[in-house]
Amino acid sequence: IDTNLRSKRLQKTKEIDDYTYARRLYLTTIGRIPTQKELLEFIDDRDSNKKDKLIQKLLNSSGYVNHQLNWWTDMLRVKDRVNGTNINVGAVYRKWLRDSLYSKKPYDQIVRELVGSSGKLLDGGEAISYYLRDRGMQEDNLSHTIRIFLGTRLECAMCHNHPFDKWTQKQFYEMTAFTSGIGNVRLRDQ
């Protein structure tokens, strides 16, 4: 790092103090500032690996899972009700996400289970909530899927060729055809 900085004639930034480090780490990993007790425990720790220990402690905490769950539910636009049912699809979806995060399921597996989901919602097919969220709106689901998992915005290709990228309207609807066969039986209250 030092060699790279010198080659670019850049100055190394000062190392932050333990108070700032703990505050930033808590906010980043679990979404809140440390309590006074937590902060003082970290400050008073004389172990040379105290930063690594704190990182591991926070990554293995329920606070981390809950913070990640908030991020995932925002990203996936989880909603409680799906048109045409009184089943709280959002609660089932959130439980599946929470269980996936607690079990430390790898990111690629979560995505595969969401995009390739099948089965019955209340019989082990909780990931199907990803498609139920946009029930009857395959175009919205596709543009959302592409944006979240591939980092490309395709919404404009619903109506015309993308003005800045290579995507055509025809390609958009070809991709939409992949999920247009996804159907569901009438959801009934259970």
Residue ranges of predicted features:
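Short, structured secondary-structure elements
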Residues: 2-190
